[in-house]
Amino acid sequence: INFSMERLGAHTMPAGLYADWNDCLRLGKKGESTFVAFQLYYAMSIIKGYALDRGDNEYAAYIDKVQPELGKSLEACWDEDRFIRGYRENGEIVGAKKDPEASMWLNPQSWSVISGFASDKQAETAMEKVHEILNTPFGVKIMEPPYVDHYFDGALMHIFNPDTKENGGIFSQTQGWAILAESLLGHGDRAFEYFLESSPANMNDKAEVRILEPYVHGQFTESTRSPYAGRSHVHWLTGTGSTVMVGCVEGICGMRPNAEGLVISPSIPHTWDGFKIEKNFRGKHLSIDIQNPDHVQSGVKSMTVNGEAVEGNFVCECKMTEQTNIVV
């Protein structure tokens, strides 16, 4: 947090520097990254909770001061039906809706939801545009349209063919964020759709298309403009496994731990009758039975812990026993 707050640009958002995650997007010391700004906003929410737990009211008050200011900067990044990607050092917008190329980027949309910043309307609108513009049979593209004629000096992805690598390819790590964002919105059907599209195992019968081993994520997959659409590259060199794990466990399965216990909020395909989880949690064993007789995508109607009805969908650690049986 301190690192980012010490490196703010003209719009009081974190500088993009040499790269913000996207190795081919050089926004510079004065350019700014909306993606990182959302991550910073999220980090502030998390660290404030820990500060309060520790009795550090001074730091919590600091967050209360700077987070709304960052929120104002992020609100200015909303462009009709999407969040922009950021600002160049000269103040020019990257990822504006009117841009002829690279006008829609995945990460700002998914992280606007994950961070908790986007309003309900913004979140629904932005993620619907993600599905409309960026989704493919092989996963969700990093951005669209790819750079061909209208790139700037810091957009190094233009050296790659359209729909390849950072130039409109399907980056595996971002799929976990898209899965999590849709899950947080309660869109179980779409979250699972994104999981299946990008799942290596789901391409078992198309090995000649995917090429990579069916048990490992690659860095990226070529998208629909490529003559090799669906082919994946750069195995064993990506943070995708952990990102998709979070998207599936905390998102689709809805197991969301916090300092006090466990929130249970599944977002599943409406066709599922339910599922069961055996989970070790802080020295306790949890047997969790998720039942979906009404075939909805999300929303907890009732929950019992060891036969006792509890309000809402939160299981306090103080109520957990060595063997805890939970029915949702």
Could you describe each region identified by the protein language model?
Residues L17-D20, Y42, G307:
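Short, small-residue-rich loop/turn micro-motifs
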Residues C24-A37, E92-S115, H158-Q175, L180, ...:
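Solvent-exposed loop and edge beta-strand segments that line ligand/cofactor-binding
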Residues I1-K30:
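Active-site lining segments of carbohydrate-active enzymes
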Residues A10, D53, K72, H187-R190:
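Secondary-structure boundary elements
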Residues Q39-M157, L196, P200-Y228, N280:
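Catalytic cores of carbohydrate-active enzymes
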Residues M13-G16, F83-I84, M143, H217, ...:
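Short clusters of hydrophobic/aromatic residues that line enzyme substrate/ligand-binding pockets
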Residues E132-N135, F160-K165, W177-V328:
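Non-catalytic C-terminal accessory modules of carbohydrate-active enzymes
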